[in-house]
Amino acid sequence: MFEGPLQDVIDEFSRLPGIGPKSAQRIALHLLNEEPEDIERFQSALGRLQRGVTFCRICHNISQEDVCRICADSNRDKSIICVVEESKDIQVIERTAEYRGRYHVLGGALDPLNGIGPKELNVTPLVQRIGGALPDVALGAKGGGASLGDADTPADGESSGADAAETGNAKTAAVETDVEYDEAPEITEVIIATDPNTEGEATASYLGRLLRDFPGLTVTRLASGIPMGGDLEFVDELTLSRAFAGRTAL
């Protein structure tokens, strides 16, 4: 183990996803041999990243402006929303040139074992965009409001938030948000494009139950062709194009 500033840099790089101690050490040693102006340029870029990048107030995509370029594009189909887990998934879909609607970034997927329930995701702003109201039981308690079981058939004597809304037994509450929208286009379709793994499938099923009773709204899921257990980020364009073409209703 190194000491002092070098070890501090190694420790910081080790905190980044996908970078282990050995990779962090190689990066730190490489930076140690760089010219001072290169180090300053790297530091400047990190500073600009923190100061100059924000999240779109409409879709929560990474943006340099209050509204991202996709939401600001008048040529995009405003009646369709594609729901993804992370901003990186938008980049993958855009490369296919198959989709011309707008997006909504959840900021993750349901993972109750790690304390991620609906309240930790951008579910409420999604419903706000559609123009409806949430059942007061739909979001649940922090960190545990939704379990992977919520996406499946409820146990005897129990009902999900969407089922309760369906039978009229749940109270509804207006969606509270600080976001003000310049326009409220009619949404006719929501495409669920979460990753085809356990958490992504649970999230898709949860959203399908939550949104399926909105009048005039079709909720679809990307079709087969994307391998189970994979990440959307690594799917090739042809496979993703076929998945979009063959999407089915939930």
Curated annotation (Swiss-Prot):
Record protein name field:
Recombination protein RecR
Q: Where are the zinc fingers (C4-type)?
A: 56-71
What GO molecular functions are on record for this protein? DNA binding; zinc ion binding
A GO BP entry is: DNA recombination
Q: Which gene encodes it?
A: recR
Does Zinc appear among the keywords? yes
Coiled-coil regions listed in the entry: none
Annotated signal peptide: none
Q: Which CDD domains match?
A: TOPRIM_recR (cd01025)
Superkingdom is Bacteria
Q: What does this protein do?
A: May play a role in DNA repair. It seems to be involved in an RecBC-independent recombinational process of DNA repair. It may act with RecF and RecO.
**InterPro entries, A to Z:** DNA_Rcmb_RecR, Rcmb_RecR, Rcmb_RecR_Znf, TOPRIM_dom, TOPRIM_RecR
- Residues covered by region (Disordered): 148-172
- Entry keyword set: DNA damage, DNA recombination, DNA repair, Metal-binding, Zinc, Zinc-finger
What's this protein's family per the entry? Belongs to the RecR family.
Question: Short name of one Pfam family for this protein?
Answer: RecR_HhH
**Annotated ranges, domain Toprim:** 79-227
Cytoplasm recorded as keyword: no
